[in-house]
Structure formats: structure tokens, C-alpha cells
């Protein structure tokens, strides 16, 4: 097992690997964000198509607007977004997963981008944890 995953496993067993909802009030260095995204972008995906994209938002006004307009009525998650130093929005390119695998893609493609995005989100969290950056995956998405 990779040493980073072993350290994560040890944290999980000790209760220190859970989601973080109370963040320090200090910015995350851009270089650290780049490192986390760089590691996460190489997460496994169907046919190695890499359909996942990241948008990192650290502007407080924009984070507040996202919290207000994208997740109305979810007060707890709104507070989590506003307290975080940065918000990483995980997106994907529809129809890209498995591209080039024609027979399978036509039959099984629906939803695989979400699967690939989940793998990438977990890799993102593991990479962030190694830099002592707390994360919290919010299960909020636009189905359209």
C-alpha cells in the first residue's frame, strides 16, 4: 500500500480522517491547491479519459454567492462553504467517460462520469490530507 494511503488508514482508525467542517481562518497557499489538484487529476477513470475538472473558488464574495444561489435552504452546508478557505467544485465533461470504447460506451456510459468524479474527489481529499488541509465532500450537485 502507498505510504500516503497507509497514513490515511492510520488516521481513519484513530478518528482523525473524518470530514472537516470547522476550518482555520487562513488562506491555503495556491501552490498547495495546485499540488492537490495535480494529484487528483490523475485519478483512474474509464479508458483513462479523465472527464473530471476542478474549479477552485477562494473569493469570499463568490463563495457566499455560490452558497446562497446554488444550495438554498441548506443552512449547515452554507455555513461550511462560507467558513472554508477555498471551495473546490468538482465537475465533469458529460459523455467523455469510456469514449473510444464504442459498444460498451453506448450501453453502459450513463453515470460513469459520476463514478469517475467520486474517485477523483476521494483522491483530492487524500492529497489534501497529506498537506494538512481539511476537506468535506458536500453531496450537492446539479443533475442537469
Give residue ranges: language-model regions.
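Acidic, surface-exposed loops and disordered segments
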Residues: 1-144
Amino acid at each position: 500500500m502507498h505510504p500516503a494511503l497507509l497514513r490515511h488508514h492510520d488516521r481513519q482508525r484513530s478518528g482523525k480522517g473524518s470530514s472537516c467542517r470547522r476550518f482555520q481562518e487562513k488562506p491555503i497557499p495556491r501552490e498547495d491547491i495546485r499540488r492537490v489538484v495535480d494529484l487528483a487529476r490523475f485519478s483512474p477513470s474509464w479508458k483513462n479519459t479523465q472527464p473530471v475538472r476542478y474549479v477552485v473558488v477562494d473569493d469570499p464574495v463568490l463563495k457566499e454567492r455560490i452558497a446562497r444561489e446554488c444550495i438554498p435552504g441548506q443552512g449547515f452546508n452554507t455555513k461550511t462553504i462560507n467558513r472554508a478557505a477555498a471551495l473546490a467544485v468538482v465537475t465533469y465533461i458529460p459523455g467523455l467517460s469510456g469514449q473510444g470504447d464504442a459498444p460498451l460506451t453506448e450501453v453502459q456510459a450513463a453515470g460513469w462520469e459520476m463514478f469517475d468524479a467520486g474517485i477523483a474527489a476521494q483522491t483530492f481529499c487524500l492529497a489534501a490530507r497529506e498537506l494538512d488541509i481539511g476537506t468535506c465532500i458536500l453531496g450537492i450537485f446539479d443533475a442537469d
